[in-house]
Amino acid sequence: MDNKLRIDYLSNHIDYKVVQHKDMYHFNTDTCLLGEFINIKKNDTVLDVGTHNGALLVYIIKKGWIATGIEINAKALEICKLTLKENNINATLIDGDFTSYNFKSKFDCIVSNPPYFTFKDKQTNKNENKNIARHENSLTIESLCKALKQNLKENGVIYLIYKANRINELEKELNNNSLYINELQYVYSKVKPNPKSVLVKASFNNNGKIMQDNKYI
């Protein structure tokens, strides 16, 4: 194996392996929280948007769901292939842009840990691979929500993790595309008073109620 590659394990799952490249974006706590948050029927079709090194795909496939991953960064997709091989699992992988790709069919579930830093939030990294994963240069909140609407089945569900202080922006864009938040889980660090991230479940179902909970890590 390339000396810039290493194998890590997803939290609480010693059999969930992820290949990571020294110079590319690594999975983090958000990835693990989202993987555990997803709850759908066995054999549902799931699309992982921005699949990167395949960490979320491992959760999805190991739980018995039929997975497709789309990734705009070809280098990251090659790492994802190695992750699948290490776990002896299979998925359909697409080298493409979620906002413009023409899928053959819609999905029961779409999941994503999208880039949620704007260029105003934080100085961008000189590493272009990390910029693609972290900053809204190729996948804005507006384009994400529009594509979610286009590719989700009528009774489908969306699972996301997003920056907590941008939840109002996310909700607005979801609503603009006839999508509605059904559940929120704010993620708190035990040493900080304000939540950093929020887990989001959304769908076309607008029942006027949002289940809300807090998670402490």
Give the location of each predicted region:
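Short glycine/threonine-rich catalytic loop with a Thr-x-Gly-x-Asp
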Residues: 25-27, 52-53, 192-193
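SAM-dependent transferase fold signal centered on methyltransferase-like domains
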Residues: 33, 62-63, 78, 83-87, ...
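Conserved SAM/SAH cofactor-binding pocket of Class I
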Residues: 36-103, 109-123
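Conserved Class I SAM-dependent methyltransferase catalytic core
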Residues: 17, 138-195
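S-adenosyl-L-methionine
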Residues: 2-41
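Residue-level signal for inorganic ion chemistry
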Residues: 34, 113, 144, 202
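Mobile active-site "lid"/loop adjacent to the S-adenosyl-L-methionine
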Residues: 114-143
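Flexible, glycine-/basic-rich loop-and-beta segments that form/coincide
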Residues: 191-217
